[in-house]
Amino acid sequence: MHRTEPTINCVHDGTRSLHLSIDTTRALPAHSGNEPTRTHLAAVRVSLLKTIPVAPPKILKDSSFRVTLRIDPSEEYCTMHRSKSLAFVALFAALISSSALVSIPLKPVPLVLQNAAAVLTGLLLGPRDGALAVLSFLGAGLLGLPVFSGGRGGYTALFAPTGGFLLGYILAATLAGAIAQHHRLSCTPPRGGGRALLLWIRLTVATLVGFLSIYSIGLPVLGYVLGLRTGELMLGVFLPFFLADTLKIALVVLLAHHLAPTVRRHLYRHG
């Protein structure tokens, strides 16, 4: 039994609907005398954007049929300008470094803005470029530049009690960028009340996870270096500092929401 691929004709009527006229004549058996075979359409690839699943149509007597697909406008296709991406990595690495100027010396760890800058970097640049920006910032500090809190620099900062928090910035940018679904955040502006609310929720969860991931590395290292127990870490470090971080979380969410269109306009091209 010889079968060939069906012919697919696409017609766009200017709305969100894409009409596919699919001729299955050539997909039928070569011999005659039988009713046309039922054709199962598993999926249709549209403009190389994504594979859109379609329910198998029931064809018993007709050799052609018409399918209407509703295109979701949130699935907008865009690609990244790689040269601009590297420029943004350098820009946000400088942002994280400059945020070291805002530091309140407290014990056992200072109150800083660098954790907020690291999470914001992940939200806007995504997990890969966000982590790359943090690594660039850490590399500058390891070379001796005074980019760590309090104007510190050098490899000894990583072996200090707060060294775990610096390493946690990498995880924070990665997780925040991944949870925020960076590609959709950067490529697709929110449309409609439901989607706008979903964007706020996604940004809030991503930011919260980013901050908590910094503590997940920083607290164990701090406890190991200073010999503090878990209870002492939770009551003396985590609770008071995380209460202050709630204000930074709100600030990061607001900044990410308002800066995402700028990133989308400069960093991505559509088509």
From Swiss-Prot:
- Top-level taxon of the source organism: Bacteria
Query: What parts of the sequence cross the membrane?
Result: 86-106, 131-151, 159-179, 208-228, 235-255
Question: Which InterPro entries does the UniProt record give?
Answer: BioY
- One Gene Ontology molecular-function label: biotin transmembrane transporter activity
Q: Tell me where it resides.
A: Cell membrane
Q: Name one GO cellular component term.
A: plasma membrane
Identify the main location: membrane
Instruction: Locate the coiled-coil region(s) and give their ranges.
Output: none
Alphabetic keyword roster: Cell membrane, Membrane, Transmembrane, Transmembrane helix, Transport
Say if the entry is tagged with keyword Ubl conjugation.
no
Membrane topology of the entry: Multi-pass membrane protein
Q: Which Gene3D superfamilies match?
A: 1.10.1760.20
Q: What does this protein do?
A: Probable biotin transporter.
State the family it belongs to. Belongs to the BioY family.
Query: What name has this protein been given in UniProt?
Result: Probable biotin transporter BioY
Gene assigned in the entry: bioY
